[in-house]
Amino acid sequence: MAKKSGSGLQSSAGLMRYYEADKNAIHIQPKTVLIAGALVGIAVIFLSAVNGFWP
């Protein structure tokens, strides 16, 4: 069998770059997304009812 060369540093270097970029990203909690979606849904239903588009 062929012997693998290298110690896998390239794959771990890619992971380190990913985690460094992830620290700089904007983080939003899942609860915040659900609440925002519910509020938008309620607003759409309310505005549809007010403007006479309710079925």
Swiss-Prot record:
Belongs to the SEC61-beta family. The keyword Transmembrane applies. Keywords: Cell membrane, Membrane, Protein transport, Translocation, Transmembrane, Transmembrane helix, Transport. Residues 1-29 are cytoplasmic. One of its GO terms (cellular component) is plasma membrane. It is a single-pass membrane protein. Residues 50-55 are extracellular. The chain crosses the membrane at residues 30-49. Signal peptide: none annotated. It is found in: Cell membrane. This is Preprotein translocase subunit SecG. Component of the protein translocase complex. Heterotrimer consisting of alpha (SecY), beta (SecG) and gamma (SecE) subunits. Can form oligomers of the heterotrimer. It comes from Methanosarcina mazei (strain ATCC BAA-159 / DSM 3647 / Goe1 / Go1 / JCM 11833 / OCM 88) (Methanosarcina frisia). The keyword Cell membrane applies. InterPro entries: Preprot_translocase_SecG, SecG/Sec61-beta/Sbh. Its main location: membrane. Involved in protein export. The function of the beta subunit is unknown, but it may be involved in stabilization of the trimeric complex. One of its GO terms (biological process) is protein transport. It comes from the Archaea.
